[in-house]
C-alpha cells in the first residue's frame, strides 16, 4: 500500500480525486441527510405523553409517519453507500452494456428517491402541523430535523438524477459509428460534384498531365509492326 509522503501526494491520490467528483459528493450528502432523518426519529422520535408513560410517535402520534421516515432514511442511506462503492469500481467495467445499464439504473433510482422524499416531506410536515403543541415532553427537535433534511434530500436526489442523465447522455455508445462515417466518405466520393464544390480541372498546357498523356497515347495504344528494308544491288 502506497503511503503519501506529503499533502500534495495525498491531494493527488486516486481516492481523493474520486471523492472530489460531483457524483461522489452528491452521494455523500444524500447518505448523510438520510442518516440524519432516520437516526433522529429512531432515537427521539418516540416519546411518552405528559399524562402516561406509553411511547408514541412525536408526529401527531402517528406511528406510520415515523416508520416511513425511518425506513426510507435507512434504505436511502444504504443505497447511497452501495452506489458510492460501485462508482469506485466503475472505471474497471470492461463491458459497455453493463456500464450503460448501471448508469440507467442510477438515473431511475435517483428519480424514484426524489419522488419518495417529496411525498415523505409533505406527509411528515402535515403530521407535524397537526400535532398538538407541547403534547410531548421531548422529541420536537428530532421531528423538525427529520422534516428539514427530508426537504434537503429532495434537492440532492434531483441533482443526482441530473448528473446521472448527463453521464448517460455523454457516454451513450453510437452503434456502427465507424461504418456510418466510412459510408459517408464513400458516398461523398461517388456523388457528382455540386455547383458549390470546387472542381479541379486538369491544365491543357504543354506541361500539363493531359497534354503529356495525349502526346504519348498514339505510341502506347497502337504499336507499329517492324518494316523490311530493301538493300540496293552493287
From Swiss-Prot:
Signal peptide: none annotated. It is found in: Membrane. This is Synaptogyrin-4. Pfam families: MARVEL. Residues 209-221 have a biased composition (Low complexity). Keywords: Membrane, Transmembrane, Transmembrane helix. It comes from the Eukaryota. The chain crosses the membrane at residues 25-45, 66-86, 104-124, 145-165. One of its GO terms (cellular component) is neuromuscular junction. It is a multi-pass membrane protein. Residues 191-226 are annotated as: Disordered. Belongs to the synaptogyrin family. Its main location: membrane. PROSITE patterns: MARVEL. InterPro entries: Marvel, Synaptogyrin. Residues 18-169 form the MARVEL domain.
Amino acid at each position: 500500500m502506497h503511503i503519501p509522503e506529503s499533502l500534495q501526494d495525498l491531494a493527488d491520490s486516486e481516492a481523493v480525486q474520486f471523492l472530489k467528483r460531483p457524483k461522489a459528493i452528491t452521494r455523500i450528502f444524500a447518505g448523510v441527510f438520510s442518516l440524519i432523518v432516520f437516526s433522529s426519529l429512531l432515537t427521539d422520535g418516540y416519546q411518552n405523553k405528559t399524562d402516561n408513560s406509553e411511547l408514541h410517535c412525536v408526529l401527531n402520534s402517528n406511528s406510520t409517519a415515523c416508520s416511513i421516515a425511518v425506513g426510507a432514511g435507512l434504505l436511502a442511506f444504504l443505497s447511497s453507500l452501495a452506489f458510492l462503492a460501485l462508482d469506485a469500481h466503475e472505471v474497471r467495467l470492461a463491458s459497455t452494456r453493463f456500464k450503460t445499464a448501471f448508469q440507467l439504473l442510477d438515473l431511475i433510482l435517483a428519480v424514484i428517491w426524489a419522488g419518495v422524499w417529496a411525498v415523505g416531506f409533505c406527509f411528515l410536515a402535515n403530521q407535524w402541523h397537526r400535532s398538538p403543541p407541547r403534547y410531548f415532553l421531548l422529541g420536537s427537535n428530532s421531528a423538525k430535523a427529520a422534516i428539514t433534511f427530508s426537504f434537503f434530500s429532495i434537492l440532492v436526489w434531483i441533482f443526482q438524477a441530473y448528473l446521472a442523465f448527463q453521464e448517460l447522455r455523454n457516454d451513450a455508445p453510437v452503434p456502427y459509428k465507424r461504418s456510418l462515417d466510412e459510408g459517408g466518405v464513400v458516398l461523398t466520393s461517388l456523388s457528382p460534384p455540386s455547383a458549390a464544390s470546387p472542381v479541379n480541372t486538369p491544365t491543357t498546357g504543354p506541361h500539363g498531365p493531359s497534354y503529356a498523356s495525349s502526346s504519348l497515347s498514339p505510341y502506347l495504344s497502337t504499336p507499329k509492326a517492324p518494316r523490311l528494308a530493301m538493300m540496293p544491288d552493287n
